[in-house]
Every structure is written in C-alpha cells, then in structure tokens.
Design a protein with these regions (language model features):
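C-terminal edge and immediately downstream basic/flexible tail or linker adjoining helix-turn-helix-like DNA-binding
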Residues: 2-3, 13, 120-121, 125, ...
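Internal acidic/polar
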Residues: 3-7, 85, 92-116, 143, ...
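Short, charged helix-capping/linker segments at alpha-helix termini
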Residues: 15-24, 34-53
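Residues within the DNA-recognition helix of helix-turn-helix
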Residues: 29, 50, 161-168
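Structural recognition of an alpha-helix C-terminal capping motif at a helix-to-coil junction
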Residues: 35, 49-56, 60, 69-81
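Helix-turn-helix DNA-binding module
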Residues: 45, 124-132, 136, 140-157, ...
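Residue cluster at the C-terminal edge of the helix-turn-helix DNA-binding motif
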Residues: 57, 61, 86, 129, ...
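Arg/Lys-rich amphipathic alpha helix in sigma70-family domain 2
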Residues: 60-67, 77-98, 111-112, 164
Length: 202
C-alpha cells in the first residue's frame, strides 16, 4: 500500500530505536505466521508459545538481518525453527483451533471442524521436517527454493520431504493413492483431499 514503509525499512527502523517499527512488522505478517505456527505444531497452545518465542528471537536478532533474503523468509525461518524446537521437546497433541469465520450452516461448521481436526492429526504424524516442508509449500504456496532457504536444506530435500508427506497424508485422509476413510478426490493437487481447510479458518 502506498505510504507504508517496506519490510526492510521497518527492520532498520527497529534497530535504530523506533519503538513502533517491530510492532508494525509483526502486525503485517501476524496472520500468516500464526497459520504457519499452528499447522507446524498442531495445536493452538504450542503455536502461541512458539510464535511468542520466535518474535522475541526476531526482536533481539534484528540487527543481524543483512537483507540477503526477504524479511518474510527471515521471519518464516525463525517461526519454523521455534516450532521445530518445541516439537523436539514435547510431543504435541492437535486440538481444534478456536475462532475463525462464522458460517451460516451449523452442519457445515461441524463438518469443517471435523476436517480441520483430521488434518491437524494427520500433520502431527509427519516428521517435523516433512511437516514444515509440506505446510510451507502446499498450505502457503511458497516456492520450493524459498522453503529450502527457510529450512536451510537443499531444494531436493524439500521436494523429497513434500513427496513423502503428501503420500502419508493421502493415506491418512483418504486422498489420491490413500485409504478410503474420507473419500479422497483424485483431482486434489496434493495428499490433502479437496475441501479440507488448510487454513484452519474456512
């Protein structure tokens, strides 16, 4: 939007002592960072804790940002690392994310809540590396090259993690090539059957 400073300027302003700059940067990216944290950890409590850890880390390490990647990539990396650290310390159990958009059809809301829980449970059965890769590529639509930069692994590793994750999700959710628990759609682009609420809000 015209008149809004670009992300790198906000980082620089924060480092220079502007008390409002980092708050604006977080506000700008808050929703997508929360979605990444929720899908990577699998439950709202761990997601909130990981996001708080990540933002404190970003706040303190902003002076080390050199602009070699986009600010978004830098923030994603910090959030994903915080989530993976939390997953390594404790086995997270998915729960239903609260909030979201209202729907006029209660039956549809119940269906989507069930799908959301199924999806989070299926994601929780992936290895942390596979989960982070498939969330960033399939749920957020990031280029494989950017995800490789975020996760600090080769592009080929991201591709193989996504392929294994999709096959596993297809089996868990009844997608293409998987079982029939949820009646997968052969036209679905990944292991998640069409109609499943990747964003946790729809």
């Amino acid at each position: 939007v015209t008149g809004e400073p670009p992300d790198p300027d906000l980082v620089a302003a924060h480092v220079a002592g502007d008390p409002e700059a980092f708050a604006e940067l977080f506000r700008r990216h808050r929703d997508v960072l929360w979605a990444v944290a929720l899908r990577t950890t699998g439950n709202p409590e761990d997601a909130a804790d990981a996001l708080q850890d990540a933002m404190l880390s970003a706040l303190r390490s902003a002076a080390t940002f050199r602009g070699r990647s986009a600010v978004r990539t830098w923030l994603y990396r910090i959030v994903v690392n915080a989530c993976l650290d939390r997953l390594r310390r404790s086995a997270a159990r998915p729960a239903v994310p609260l909030g979201g958009h209202d729907t006029p059809d209660p039956a549809d809301a119940i269906t989507r809540t069930g799908q959301r829980v199924d999806l989070l449970r299926a994601l929780a059965t992936l290895s942390p590396g596979q989960r982070a890769a498939v969330v960033l590529v399939d749920a957020h639509g990031l280029p494989v090259s950017e995800v490789a930069e975020i996760l600090e692994v080769p592009v080929g590793t991201v591709k193989s993690r996504c392929a294994r994750a999709r096959a596993h999700l297809a089996k868990e959710l009844g997608g293409p090539g998987g079982g029939s628990r949820r009646g997968g759609n052969p036209s679905a682009p990944s292991g998640v059957p069409s109609g499943y609420p990747w964003d946790g809000r729809r």
